[in-house]
From Swiss-Prot:
NCBIfam families: nickel pincer cofactor biosynthesis protein LarC
Name of the protein: Putative nickel insertion protein
Compositionally biased residues, Basic residues: 74-99
Annotated family: Belongs to the LarC family.
Lineage of the organism: Bacteria, Pseudomonadati, Thermodesulfobacteriota, Desulfovibrionia, Desulfovibrionales
Length: 417
């Protein structure tokens, strides 16, 4: 399996990601041609050059805005930190239009980009929109994009999607993401690093802080990673095929570079079939045994893989019951609704799991009492055990007026012959 491994020891910004993709082998001409499909060529030009930080050479990308050629990208200029999209800090001012999410959707959907690139680009923008909306108590279509709605950030995000699909890798892996430290100026004033949007986008993902007193991961970079990453590991076992460096604009105490590696991971292929599943759980302390039993029957009838109860003791020493339901990943929403409908719970925990299953087959066994269906468990093509179907055994016990245990005994004798 070929992967991209993002080594974010110095964080990530949108321009550094584009630079790393070009350094990895994406054709600059191809990228520029694809970006032209947005119809924004009168707003920007892409400057691609070679640069170095702390002796590490790589590719640098500058998105030069058509009306701002006088805005120089000097390494020492205090407005050009790794801090924000193209290493601009939050307080730089662009005079071009700051589009909102609806504007961006119309721009991308009306372009000639392929559908995969469109979908990925919009997914990244929606991650930013959701973060901004939560922070500002708004909706994704009402919230005002600041830097992320600017031309250079649109180029960063759509460019990232173009490069991702051009490389055709199997998965994207990532190290812990360095966020930096200190404070940064943004549209709402001076904010601690990470910026609120960055923090919201990366919620639940492994990060580090304090390598430098600058913003090292921007909202754009964070959203790109959050959309692409399949797995996090600081020390993956992999065979590196190629290493690329995207050069940042500021010269920090540590190399201001984004290292991205094309690598191969040996997959341990299991011959055992697995099923992506969900374990849904809730605790109930105000339903009778009869009501719980009826709920279990209903959930099983509706197609749950398994349902069981566990006795627990809750707060104030109240006896209660944990309902655990196993279902397929695609049926998660269906069974959450059924649990809410048929029980008194107000909340459900969902755990993503992978269920490993054996192949099964069925055959008929003739006994002195009658025919019984046998279920066979198969491992590596061989039957490792068999058991009679309960309902057949119950029917024979009732038919002959004998205990169920006697039916099982007779089946056992036949199988010994």
């Amino acid at each position: 399996m070929n992967i991209l491994y993002y080594d974010c020891f110095s964080g990530i910004s949108g321009d550094m990601n584009l630079a790393a993709m070009i350094d990895l082998g994406v054709s600059p001409d191809f990228l520029i041609t694809e970006l032209a499909k947005l119809g924004m060529e009168d707003e920007f030009s892409l400057k691609i050059s070679q640069d170095s930080r702390k002796g590490i050479f790589g590719t640098r990308v500058d998105v030069e805005l058509a009306h701002q050629h006088e805005h120089h990208h000097d390494h020492g200029h205090h407005h050009h930190g790794h801090g924000h999209h193209h290493d601009h800090t939050h307080d730089h001012h662009h005079h071009h239009e700051h589009r909102n999410l609806k504007d961006i959707e119309e721009l991308i959907n009306s372009s000639d980009l392929n559908d995969k690139v469109k979908a990925t680009s919009l997914a990244i923008f929606k991650r930013v929109a959701k973060a901004e909306a939560k922070i500002h108590g708004s909706t994704i279509y009402e919230v005002h994009f600041h830097e992320v709605g600017a031309t250079d950030s649109i180029v960063d995000i759509v460019g990232a999607a173009i490069c991702f699909h051009e490389l055709e890798i199997d998965q994207v892996w990532c190290s812990s993401i360095e966020l930096g430290g200190g404070f940064v100026n943004c549209a709402h004033g001076k904010m601690p690093v990470p910026a609120p949007a960055t923090s919201e986008i990366l919620a639940g993902l492994p990060t580090t802080q304090g390598a430098v007193q600058q913003e090292t991961t921007t909202p754009t970079g964070a959203a790109i990673l959050a959309e692409f990453i399949n797995n996090f590991s600081d020390s993956p076992r992999m065979t590196v095929l190629k290493t690329a460096y995207g050069i940042g604009h500021r010269d920090n105490e540590i190399p201001n570079v984004l290292r991205v590696q094309l690598a191969n991971i040996e997959q341990q292929v299991s011959s055992l079939p697995t099923v992506p599943s969900r374990l849904l759980q809730c605790n109930i302390d105000d339903m009778t045994g009869e009501m719980l039993g009826a709920a279990l029957d209903q959930l099983m009838e509706d197609g749950a893989m398994d349902v069981h109860f566990t006795s627990i003791v809750m707060k104030k020493n109240r006896p209660a019951t944990t309902l655990s339901l196993l279902c397929s990943a695609e049926d998660e929403d269906k069974f959450k609704r059924l649990i809410f409908k048929h029980t008194s719970t107000l909340g459900i925990k969902s755990i993503a799991i992978e269920k490993t299953v054996l192949d099964i087959s069925f055959d008929k066994l003739e006994t002195p009492l009658g025919t019984v269906t046998m279920k066979n468990a198969i491992l590596d093509g061989e039957v490792i055990r068999s058991k009679p179907e309960l309902e057949d055994c119950r029917a024979l016990a009732k038919q002959h007026g004998i205990p169920l245990s006697e039916v099982y005994l007779q089946i056992g004798k036949v199988r010994e012959i």
